Design a protein with these regions (language model features):
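Compact, glycine-rich, soluble single-domain proteins
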Residues: 24, 32-58, 64
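Mid-chain, well-packed structural core segment of small domains
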Residues: 51-92
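Well-ordered alpha/beta subsegment
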Residues: 86-120
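A short beta-strand micro-motif
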Residues: 1-3
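Short, contiguous acidic and Ser/Thr-rich linear segments
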Residues: 8-15
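Short, basic/aromatic beta-hairpin or loop at an interaction surface
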Residues: 29-42, 82-96
């Protein structure tokens, strides 16, 4: 995952949603921000999976079905309560960033280009 000078390695899970997104890669988009979440449309539709959740962890990659959006979580969002990280509505967890560079991610603004590709 590349955003400006931020290069990150991530692991995708073997789930129907993760595999659908994997099939769209490489992908270049511009990000939107919502608190400490980056998200962008990936142009696929998907259902909310049975293990979808609104509570996520730092570094989680997720798919938000209502917005057909790929989400990168790195801290609290406007929906968070206390110290939790909460999505707007249930998301399908599709993977995670290995050692997320939280301070660098906090500098990313809406409209910044992102590129996601499979490296191995």
């Amino acid at each position: 995952i590349s955003i400006e000078d931020v290069e990150m390695q991530a692991t995708l899970l073997d789930t129907p949603t993760a595999n659908a997104i994997r099939s769209t890669l490489p992908l270049e988009r511009t990000v939107n921000t919502w608190g400490h979440e980056l998200y962008f449309d990936v142009g696929i539709s998907g259902e909310t999976e049975v293990d979808a959740s609104t509570i996520v962890q730092i570094g989680d990659l997720a798919f938000w079905p209502p917005g057909s959006a790929f989400c990168i979580f790195f801290g609290r969002t406007p929906a968070s309560q206390s110290n939790e990280i909460r999505s707007a509505s249930p998301v399908n967890i599709i993977g995670s960033i290995n050692n997320p560079p939280i301070n660098k991610l906090r500098r990313i603004r809406t409209g910044t280009a992102i590129r996601i590709a499979v490296t191995s």
